[in-house]
Amino acid sequence: MEETNRQKKIGGLLQKDLADILQNSLRESGRTGILISVSKVRVTTDLSIAKAYVSIFPSKHQEEVIKEINENKSQIKHEMAQRTRHQLRKMPDLSFYVDDSLEYIDGIEKSIKGKEDPVANPDLLDKRKKS
């Protein structure tokens, strides 16, 4: 089912504020060299749950940063509620997921440029076919 305009507006608002909060919390905790971005926020139709997809670079820090975010979920929700108190009546519950789509794209790009290029090595196509 397609998202309504209200869901899209709330998702965009939450995405912008979440990115700001997460970047500030990383900076305040003294962690440097880690880049965090919120790539997408999807809100359920009843506006009670917001799923935030977070990209973390370098990817070796993904698990520990997501764990840290989930441990501090209540503080993040409180900060979000303070920022959006004039736009939202009720703050949705937040759930965070790792967005690994950029890693997936990077893997495809590396395989095309590397030894697994089907244009340069047409024998690979026969090996990839399912029997």
Swiss-Prot record:
<keyword id="KW-0963">Cytoplasm</keyword>
<dbReference type="GO" id="GO:0030490">
    <property type="term" value="P:maturation of SSU-rRNA"/>
</dbReference>
<comment type="similarity">
    <text>Belongs to the RbfA family.</text>
</comment>
<dbReference type="InterPro" id="IPR023799">
    <property type="entry name" value="RbfA_dom_sf"/>
</dbReference>
<protein>
    <recommendedName>
        <fullName>Ribosome-binding factor A</fullName>
    </recommendedName>
</protein>
<dbReference type="GO" id="GO:0005829">
    <property type="term" value="C:cytosol"/>
</dbReference>
<comment type="subunit">
    <text>Monomer. Binds 30S ribosomal subunits, but not 50S ribosomal subunits or 70S ribosomes.</text>
</comment>
<dbReference type="GO" id="GO:0043024">
    <property type="term" value="F:ribosomal small subunit binding"/>
</dbReference>
<dbReference type="InterPro" id="IPR015946">
    <property type="entry name" value="KH_dom-like_a/b"/>
</dbReference>
<keyword id="KW-0690">Ribosome biogenesis</keyword>
<comment type="function">
    <text>One of several proteins that assist in the late maturation steps of the functional core of the 30S ribosomal subunit. Associates with free 30S ribosomal subunits (but not with 30S subunits that are part of 70S ribosomes or polysomes). Required for efficient processing of 16S rRNA. May interact with the 5'-terminal helix region of 16S rRNA.</text>
</comment>
<dbReference type="Pfam" id="PF02033">
    <property type="entry name" value="RBFA"/>
</dbReference>
<dbReference type="InterPro" id="IPR000238">
    <property type="entry name" value="RbfA"/>
</dbReference>
